[in-house]
Amino acid sequence: MTKGRLGIIGCGQLSQMLGEAANRLGFSVSYLCVDETPVVVGLGPIYYPDQLDEFLAACDAITVERESLPDDMLRKAANVGLAPNYDALVTLRERDTQKAMLDELNIPTSPWSLVTSPDQLEAALDSLPGQYARCKRTLGGYDGGALPNPYASDKPS
């Protein structure tokens, strides 16, 4: 007997690890594959975006592999029981709103600066400590590399 059915939006490696952990805790798991090739084959039923309503109806609670999902999908999932909740996901999916919230709550993060145009880049890099900066998009951009800061001639690393 299971404790209920968890729906995970996503079919990648993080969903695989989450689903395996949920199974060990006694939950059944269903997956909604958004845009990746499923690596969760054999772990539970797999649905696709055109089956969103059917997926949601089959689940007792919903969680996500990543926060950058279409608003309409998140809103529908919120009606079932979405964790983290819709507002948290919207705040967390964009790096600038995420960092601003953490700053407002006095939760330490790495130094950061929002750059919205090439003209702002030099000042932003100059305001950050060290000789390297990690430039990322505010949405997505998980693999932004550490780039040498051309404006930091004498800064310690």
Name these PLM-found stretches.
Residues M1, F55, D126-L128, T138-G141:
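Solvent-exposed alpha-helices and their adjacent loops that cap or buttress functional pockets
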Residues M1-R93, D119:
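ATP-binding N-terminal substructure of ATP-dependent carboxylate-amine bond-forming enzymes
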Residues K3-G4, F27, P129-Q131, G144:
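Short coil/turn connectors at secondary-structure junctions
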Residues G44-Q51, S113-S117, L147-S153:
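Short acidic-hydrophobic, aromatic-tinged amphipathic segments that line or gate anion-handling sites
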Residues I46-P49, V80-G81, A100-M101, P129-G130, ...:
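Short, hinge-like loop/turn segments at secondary-structure boundaries
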Residues E65, V115, K136:
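Conserved residues at the C-terminal ends of beta-strands
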Residues V90-Y132, N149:
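Glycine-/Pro-rich loop/turn segments that contact NAD(P) or position catalytic residues
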Residues S110-W112, Y132-S157:
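Glycine-rich phosphate-binding loop of ATP-grasp-fold ATP-dependent ligases
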